[in-house]
Curated annotation (Swiss-Prot):
Subcellular location(s) per record: Cytoplasm
Coiled coil: none
Residues binding substrate: 138-142, 170, 191, 271
Originating species: Aeropyrum pernix (strain ATCC 700893 / DSM 11879 / JCM 9820 / NBRC 100138 / K1)
Major localization class: cytoplasm
Identification of the protein by name: tRNA N6-adenosine threonylcarbamoyltransferase
Required cofactor(s): Fe(2+)
Length: 349
């Protein structure tokens, strides 16, 4: 990587909201992404255990930061600001990232930039696709929401009323005995199992206004298995019903807002079938569809650094002593003063 140049701004971002401790470093000059280091906690069985995740993060945080600086070819002295995801997410995991960020900020005198994890996923999509004003479907293990920018913030136009889409897929796969691993060769266990399957009666399609619900789908799918339904049929139907419901509420948001751009972001954004459905829907409305770069679909420090860079350039900083975690920090509670700025645009002012 080239050494830091005059007028260049470098931001280090820290992600620690769930299973991944990520450190990213980005620049205002090409190449924009200078480092992308990740340490992922993987359960031996079952789901995420917050305390074990926090212990894992504590062990690997220091080496991850050092590796990112080495990958970028810079020192901490070259970094202009430190950005950190303060929520939403799991408390024990968030505290590790916040502690590391506060320490770096205080020890080295670096401005601290607070970042909302959900905002960062949407901005990762905008920044990697070049879409300035899209409707965004954000689907992950802990989040399912449809948002678009209106009057200074991302507004929620639809969301899950219970569990998230990623949680539905992972929980079903685990209970059905086809995971872990949840993802292999770029395919989720449900997708692999769905090959050769067909529709089976008994799984509800639940869209309530602009919102979706998945807990009933999960219960019905597991019940069908217990009654002897073919596993491939249940996987296929569960996937088709769930994906179609989130695409429908995204379509309603496009129609309501009149916007002509759509994107898909979050961990489930890497799913080929969901991308095909989103692309078809957008095409029917004459909208441009581009999903987030698959390399930034899952949790990562780069998206925190990118969002932190945008926020920092527009004056969003806090005192390290005010860097409190917010486990339930909603995306529509965050002001976005940089919108519709994209990397490569002239700096503000």
């Amino acid at each position: 990587m080239p050494p830091k140049r005059d007028g260049e701004v470098l931001v280090l971002g820290i992600e620690s909201t769930a299973h991944t401790f990520g450190v990213g470093i980005v620049s205002t000059r090409p190449p924009i992404v200078r480092a992308d280091v990740r340490r992922r906690w993987t359960p031996r069985e079952g789901g995420i255990l917050p305390r074990e995740v926090a212990e894992f993060f504590s062990l690997h945080a220091g080496e991850a930061v050092a590796e990112a600086l080495g990958e970028a070819g810079v020192s901490i002295a070259d970094v202009d600001a430190v950005a950190v995801a303060l929520g939403p997410g799991m408390g024990p995991a968030l505290r590790v990232g916040a502690t590391v960020a506060r320490a770096l900020s205080a020890k080295y005198g670096k401005p601290l930039v607070p970042v909302n994890h959900a905002v960062a996923h949407v901005e990762a999509a905008r920044f990697t696709t070049g879409l300035r004003d899209p409707v965004a479907l954000y689907v992950a293990g802990g989040n399912t929401t449809v948002v678009s920018f209106v009057a200074g913030r991302y507004r929620t136009f639809g969301e899950t009323l219970d569990i998230a889409l990623g949680n539905l897929l992972d929980t079903f796969a685990r209970e059905a005995g086809i995971a872990p691993p949840y993802v292999a060769g770029g395919l989720h266990a449900v997708d692999r199992c769905a090959e050769g399957g067909g529709f089976v009666e008994g799984i509800p399609y639940v869209v309530k206004g602009q919102d979706v619900s998945f807990s009933g789908i999960l219960t019905a799918a597991l019940r069908l298995l217990k009654r002897g339904a073919r596993l491939s049929d249940v996987c296929y139907t569960l996937r088709e019903v769930a994906f179609s419901s989130v695409v429908e509420v995204t379509e309603r948001c496009l129609a309501h807002t009149g916007k002509r751009q759509a994107t898909l972001t979050g961990g489930v954004a890497a799913n080929r079938v969901l991308n095909e459905k989103m692309s078809l829907m957008a095409g029917l409305h004459g909208a441009v569809y581009r999903p987030v770069d698959v390399r930034l679909s899952g949790d990562n420090g780069v998206m925190i650094a990118l969002t932190g860079l945008a926020a920092y350039l527009h004056g969003v900083i806090i005192d390290p002593g005010e860097a409190y975690i917010r486990q339930r920090w909603r995306i529509d509670e965050v002001d976005i003063p940089w919108y519709p700025w994209l990397p490569g645009d002239p700096p503000p002012g």
